[in-house]
Amino acid sequence: MKGFISPLRISFVGGGTDMPFYYKKYRGEVITTAINKYTWVLINKWQSKNLLLKYSKSELVDSKKKIKHRLIKEIMKNYNFSGLDINFIADLPNRAGLGSSSSFTVALIGALEKFKGKKINKKKLAKAACDIEIKKLKDPIGKQDQYISAFGGLCHIIFKKNNVFVKKINIEKRKIINFEKSISLINTGIFRSAIKF
């Protein structure tokens, strides 16, 4: 079995400047942090040649073309695997404004790369996730979610026309503990999809 976990995120400042229409003309910058809530992807080989996908629904298909989940289908086009049992586990519900779709994408690509025996390069992983969501699926979203999900930690991310730069922000442990004590995440019960905006 191979697995990969990818964090959700909280964005502090700069959201929207990671959109292509903005950073290609100016430059985008965000301060964002990964949180200790995750998307987990676990992959097992099994005897059947079918693909068994277990997320909020279950799919059993004999061809990648028959996959209904749009993100999984697009990602699997890049791999020649068959006979896999792929399990998706999320600590929090999707559409909560915490970058869950990008965390899902990063986690699946990371798990598949590990299953192939490849070492994970964080920048390549983030770029691959951006290519899937933004270029292939044409989702009108930015790049910060994929990059913070791949890199983790507290980061200052700079978006330029042809490149992305990720700088880790180092803060004393004491200050991080005090900050964590002063914030709360509350489930409002209101969910939305970023691709509808």
Regions found by a protein language model. Give the residues of each.
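ATP-dependent small-molecule kinase catalytic core of the GHMP/sugar-kinase superfamily
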Residues: 2-4, 9-28, 42, 50-51, ...
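Anion-binding (especially nucleotide phosphate/pyrophosphate-binding) glycine-rich loop
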Residues: 3, 35-132
